[in-house]
A protein has these predicted regions:
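Surface-exposed extracellular loop regions of Gram-negative outer-membrane beta-barrel proteins
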Residues: 1-32, 45, 49-70, 138-150, ...
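Residues that act as N-cap/strand-start positions at coil-to-secondary-structure junctions
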Residues: 17, 27-29, 75-77, 115, ...
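Outer-membrane beta-barrel proteins
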Residues: 19-25, 35, 67-73, 80-82, ...
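Conserved C-terminal beta-signal and adjacent last beta-strands/turns
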Residues: 31-33, 108-208
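Gram-negative outer-membrane beta-barrel transporters
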Residues: 41-54, 60-62, 69-149, 203-205
Length: 208
């Protein structure tokens, strides 16, 4: 069960899509099959296959004037897998998501890519100069998807995003350096909404 968001109930955007206080919650039925296999104490593989059906889904109407509960159901199925390596104060995760989300009439659902994959890496480092600190590196590829670009539904480009973060405990406080969108990928998500390029952020979290 997913209740309508405040935006879907009361909001509006630059294209004139308005809210609708008469919306019903979205409903879904899901069947899952989960498997896990430990190759060793340091290597583990997990996988989940699923099939779902979504009723009363909330989307903008054909005139793009307001949000409505659609009469056409959504059928979803997919396979999510991850291979995990751990040891020597470091962890590596490789994952893939294959998904298919289609309306009952065969049309693709908006903003739902059929493929995404990536990798996560974390390591605890003990430097003779800076002492111990944690390093995290994350990569995610998101495949193409359908979205409304202001005039029609069009296929949006795939993206490759890399984030890097370094965190250090300093007298009970946390110092952090974060590099987001390391490859300076230029993209819109959702369509017509440009996302930030490469950014450097320095943080300090004090514990009282």
């Amino acid at each position: 069960l997913r209740n309508p968001s405040l935006y879907e109930l009361y909001g509006s955007d630059n294209y004139g899509i308005g809210g609708n206080t008469k919306l019903n919650p979205e409903k879904s039925e899901t069947n899952e099959l989960y498997g896990e296999y430990n190759f060793s104490e340091t290597i583990k593989f997990t996988s989940t296959a699923y099939r779902a059906k979504v009723f009363d889904r909330i989307e903008s109407n054909a005139a793009y004037s307001k949000h409505e509960n659609e009469l056409i159901d959504i059928n979803q199925e997919g396979l999510e897998s991850e291979l995990l390596f751990s040891g020597n104060n470091q962890n590596v995760g490789l994952y893939t998501n294959f998904s298919k989300s289609r309306k009952a009439n065969g049309q693709a659902q908006s903003r739902r890519p059929d493929l995404s994959y990536g990798a996560n890496y974390s390591k605890k480092i003990n430097s003779s100069i800076y002492g111990p600190f944690n390093l995290n590196l994350n990569y995610k590829h998101t495949g193409q998807f359908i979205d409304y670009d202001g005039s029609k539904n069009s296929r949006q480009k795939s993206t490759d995003l890399v984030d890097l973060s370094i965190k250090k405990n300093w007298f009970g406080n946390t110092l952090s350096i974060n590099l987001t969108n390391l490859l300076n990928e230029r993209y819109e998500k959702p369509a017509t909404y440009s996302q930030d390029g490469r950014q450097l952020k320095v943080g300090f979290n004090k514990v009282y």
